[in-house]
């Protein structure tokens, strides 16, 4: 067993060796290095064919038509293209968008930008288990609502929203529905030929592919129109200009092909490892799982250890790679906005750790992590006057702290 142990697969994944091997074929002079937009020679044709094959693999995993896949630089760009592209194109129809307070920053920051442009955004509060209230969603849809954007699985707490039902609600009210499926693609079955989803964002590096490439699914029937946010050459049917990075696209395609093949066996294995971790930690006093345990990704566990400061716990756990808050924003010392939205107080939100297991995680690593977390929590609580007060039965919420 090698230290440190990587338990942060929701932040990124190593690239699968099979993917690396495939990508290497599309880089050097001996390989297939052509530009897929070069229509006049074999180098271009071979590159174009490789892109088509990858596009098909990606479409197959999510039950889409390959013509509905638009390549982007990642899920952040896909989210930007979906929200800005739709809202700007349909602004004569309406200027109202609905999302949720626990969305990824790629959605929330894009919504803030749209608000600066004069659009109106409604932010739904999640319930305490992280799920949105579908009745509340119905009640906030207006005549001028153009788009609803609700993520499939949350990046911090792994909670899975019912996108089938949300899609039905949106289709009934003639509102477009976008979902950010970055965390769920390849982990949960998604069949877009059955789901009423108009736009879906996905990433490659959360599924053992390379960083710097992602895609946006744009439904053809009923047709969804977008205003491009990047211009120059009209690639990707005018929706996203720029020379296609063939090696990255091939890598993403191969990663998605492998995921489709292995999902049925891999997800039960990951869920068993996650449950093993949970069972090893749940008996520690004053620990709370954040988010629904039923409607949840099989590889995610987000736990708050009360009376332990999250940052010091992370330092004590330097032999395991975990995160507090989400990867993009965990450099800030603000408590996680996702956990705050669930109604957790600052202390509990600050003491949360996200564990996410993946393809290379072993049972031995999980057992090591359990031992490490238990001793770290015990040690830090021994140093904590708050823990002593709690053990003495003092209600910490009733204490008036003075600020000097």
Swiss-Prot record:
Keywords: 2Fe-2S, Cytoplasm, Iron, Iron-sulfur, Metal-binding, Pyridoxal phosphate, Transferase. It catalyses: (sulfur carrier)-H + L-cysteine = (sulfur carrier)-SH + L-alanine. GO terms for cellular component: L-cysteine desulfurase complex. GO terms for molecular function: 2 iron, 2 sulfur cluster binding; cysteine desulfurase activity; metal ion binding; pyridoxal phosphate binding. GO terms for biological process: [2Fe-2S] cluster assembly. HAMAP family: Cys_desulf_IscS. This is Cysteine desulfurase IscS. The gene is iscS.
């Amino acid at each position: 067993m090698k230290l440190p142990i990587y338990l942060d697969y929701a932040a990124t994944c190593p690239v699968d060796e099979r993917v690396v091997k495939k990508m290497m074929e599309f880089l050097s002079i001996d390989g297939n290095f052509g530009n897929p937009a070069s229509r006049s020679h074999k180098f271009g044709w071979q590159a174009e064919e490789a892109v088509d094959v990858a596009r098909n693999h990606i479409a197959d995993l999510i039950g889409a038509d390959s013509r509905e896949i638009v390549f982007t630089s990642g899920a952040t760009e896909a989210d930007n293209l979906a929200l800005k592209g739709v809202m700007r194109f349909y602004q004569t129809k309406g200027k109202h968008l609905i999302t949720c307070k626990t969305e990824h920053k790629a959605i929330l920051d894009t919504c803030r930008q749209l608000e600066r442009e004069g659009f109106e955004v409604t932010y739904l509060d999640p319930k305490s288990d992280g799920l949105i209230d579908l009745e509340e969603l119905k009640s906030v849809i207006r005549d001028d609502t153009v788009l609803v954007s609700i993520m499939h699985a949350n990046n911090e707490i792994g909670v899975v929203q019912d996108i089938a039902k949300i899609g039905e609600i949106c289709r009934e009210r003639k509102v477009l529905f976008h979902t950010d499926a970055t965390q769920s693609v390849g982990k949960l079955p998604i069949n877009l030929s059955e789901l009423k989803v108009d736009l879906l964002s996905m990433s490659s590096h959360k599924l053992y592919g390379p960083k710097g490439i992602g895609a946006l699914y744009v439904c053809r029937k009923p047709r969804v129109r977008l205003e491009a946010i990047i211009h120059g050459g009209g690639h990707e049917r005018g929706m996203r200009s720029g020379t296609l990075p063939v090696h990255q696209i091939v890598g993403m395609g191969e990663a998605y092909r492998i995921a489709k093949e292995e999902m049925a066996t891999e997800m039960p294995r990951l869920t068993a490892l996650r449950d093993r971790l949970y069972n090893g930690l749940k008996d520690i006093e004053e620990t709370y799982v954040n988010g629904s345990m039923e409607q949840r990704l099989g590889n995610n566990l987000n736990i708050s250890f009360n009376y332990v400061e999250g940052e010091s716990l992370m330092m004590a756990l330097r032999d395991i790679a975990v995160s507090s808050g989400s990867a993009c924003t965990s450099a800030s010392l603000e408590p996680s906005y996702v956990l705050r939205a669930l109604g957790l107080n600052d202390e509990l939100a600050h003491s949360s750790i996200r564990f996410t297991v993946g393809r290379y995680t072993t049972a031995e690593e999980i057992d090591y992590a359990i031992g490490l977390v238990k001793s770290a929590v015990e040690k830090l609580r021994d140093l904590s006057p708050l823990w002593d007060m709690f053990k003495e039965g003092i209600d910490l919420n009733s204490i008036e702290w003075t600020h000097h």
